[in-house]
Amino acid sequence: MSDQKVFARYKANEIVTDLQHFGVKKFKSNITRRKNALRKIIANLVLGNYGEMSVLFSELLKFWQIEDDLEVKRICHEYIRVIGALKPQQAREALPFIMDDFKSRDEKLQIMALRTLVLVPVKELSDQAFDCIISLVNHKSPPEQVTRTAIYALLDLDEIDHERVLGLSSILHDIVKAQSSSPEVIVAALHTLYSIHEKNANMEPFRIPLELAFDMLELLPELNEWNKATVLEVLTTSVVPQHYLDTHEMIELALPYLQQVNTYVVLNSLKFIMYLLNYVDVIKETLAEKLSNSVIALLDKPPELQFLVLRNVILLLLSRESSLLRLDISYFFIEYNDPIYIKDTKLECLYLLANKETLPRILEELEQYATDIDIQMSRKSVRAIGNLAVKLDEDSVHDCVAVLLDLLEFGVDYVVQEIISVFRNILRKYPNNFKANVTELVKHTEVVQEPESKNAMIWIITQYSDVIPNYLELFRVFSSNMFSETLEVQFSILNSAIKFFIRSPTKETEELCMDLLKGCIDHENNPDLRDKTLMYWRLLSLTKTSRISNAITFESLKSVLDGELPLIEMNTKLDPTVLEELELNIGTIVSIYLKPVSHIFRLNKTKLLPQSPILNPNKDLLPVVGNSFPPTGANRDRQNSESQSSTKSRKTAMMDDYDKPAEKINQLKGKRKSSSNNPSKLSRKPSTLLRKLSMKRPFS
């Protein structure tokens, strides 16, 4: 039966015809028809047809009694999970059948039954779930998958009865500390304890002893990819180093997982290492290279993962005054087939990586993007050039302005408008450096059509009227159509007219000013514009009437309405507290938004660095050295000697991948050759083949 026929709303009596009371033999001979009817029930539950489907409860119980088919059992359990929350009495009636499945020898049935007990919010089922979990974790040799399910089920039961779950937490602690269970069960217990602490705001942050942290790190080779990532995530903020030597050893144990193919493992390893770097005295140069190479390797992932990585690159670039990552800017050059969200994020990375040395190559790229056929990309590239001019020092701004003036000659309307918009910010930062270019900008007065570019052009004409001979003529291009403009442009026109009159109270400026004031009062209905107009009118009337005791002079009025503007600055720094919290959430959705957790998930706990005698108050002062770390493990008495011997045996394991190509073993690619060394623009951007040919071993 097709999905289209299954996923349709049915009446209960329509499905009952397929579930009529036949004998057991009749049921056995009509399996397909019976299963299709059951599938229709689940499909209607998905569609929200609860009222009709709840009528079929008694029919479903009869199937439950006689059927051994796993799919039928799965449908029955799914039915109870959905209907049980709406009809608690039906869930109670189904409890004996659920327990029969739990007591069976089939692990899959046991897991189904346990999940049903946990997910139905009925007291009788929850009590039975607690009893089942206790019996499983206390059993001498329970099935591994069932035990894992039971441990993870405590997270759902925690929302129902937190105090009762806390009573079982000691059992989970024993599982983790004993290290006698299977690795998957140990990880499940560790993650459950961590999640319970994270979900409850009134509980202290989860902490584990240092020795247990080393045991978990040494257990990583035995785990699958997802469990590796889970352990690394839990260890972040849970283990608090007390000595530099311990920190360096944990970093060494976590470093190999930067080379994993699984992105989740790499990001959690990166997060764990970045966390530990808050508790070191020095940073090794090779560590910075390995971190950089792992990030570079992640840039070859699919676009969705690449976007996550790029957002985390922005976070890491913001984390220190001098970035720890050694990233060549060519990795962030935009490709024609990049999605728009990748292009935007790469532009942000280029902006953060820009300095005096990299600026020429970045400007060369941005100039090409600005002439691209993609209008949105072209605009953002021009905006990026303008932002770089404001961000960098005075020596670099001339290069940015030269590129903008070249693009101005390009003559495309949207490019010209964007250039005028960004030039306003440049003139705000350097008011006296580019007066000679103002006359070139105002030649394009007729081109500007968008509110932002109109505002920018009006501001430029007003601010530099002393170097524009026909400034009033240019201004009338905008003022003549004032009442058809947007509100923000109307404000700009009104402000500029007042400034012209205050600076030069001639008959021409007075007429212009009075016409606009009267027009705003007589023809405009916007209360904000009318209020501002009346305020200006009142101020001007006070300057003209000397008989009034509170009259003010033109000079006083000029200081209020036409004062000197402060220089603007581009601030790319985040609040240190917010930055600290974001670093502890690398690889999560918080790192995409670059906002505190509380702004995105209201109920989540804020992560902070645990206090320690070796916690660095200012990581910008950490030296990056080329010499090796102190010998790991020296002068440290490990409590578990068996763990030491197992670690040594793992380190001396024979290599079993000698017959595989090197590129299959090491998935990371090396630093791409710089494209700016070749003056030819045709071969300036490296192709995919060139990238592969320029690969080298990143961790050598």
UniProtKB/Swiss-Prot annotation:
Residues 653-663 have a biased composition (Basic and acidic residues). The modification Phosphoserine is found at S649, S683. Pfam families: Adaptin_N (PF01602). Keywords: Cell membrane, Coated pit, Endocytosis, Membrane, Phosphoprotein, Protein transport, Transport. The modification Phosphothreonine is found at T652. One of its GO terms (cellular component) is AP-2 adaptor complex. GO terms for molecular function: clathrin binding. Residues 625-700 are annotated as: Disordered. It is found in: Cell membrane; Membrane, Coated pit. InterPro entries: AP_beta (IPR026739), AP_complex_bsu_1_2_4 (IPR016342), ARM-like (IPR011989), ARM-type_fold (IPR016024), Clathrin/coatomer_adapt-like_N (IPR002553). It is a peripheral membrane protein. GO terms for biological process: endocytosis; intracellular protein transport; vesicle-mediated transport. It comes from the Eukaryota. Belongs to the adaptor complexes large subunit family. Adaptor protein complex 2 (AP-2) is a heterotetramer composed of two large adaptins (alpha-type subunit APL3 and beta-type subunit APL1), a medium chain (mu-type subunit APM4) and a small adaptin (sigma-type subunit APS2). Interacts with APS2. Present with 1670 molecules/cell in log phase SD medium. Adaptins are components of the adaptor complexes which link clathrin to receptors in coated vesicles. Clathrin-associated protein complexes are believed to interact with the cytoplasmic tails of membrane proteins, leading to their selection and concentration. Beta adaptin is a subunit of the plasma membrane adaptor. This is AP-2 complex subunit beta. It comes from Saccharomyces cerevisiae (strain ATCC 204508 / S288c).
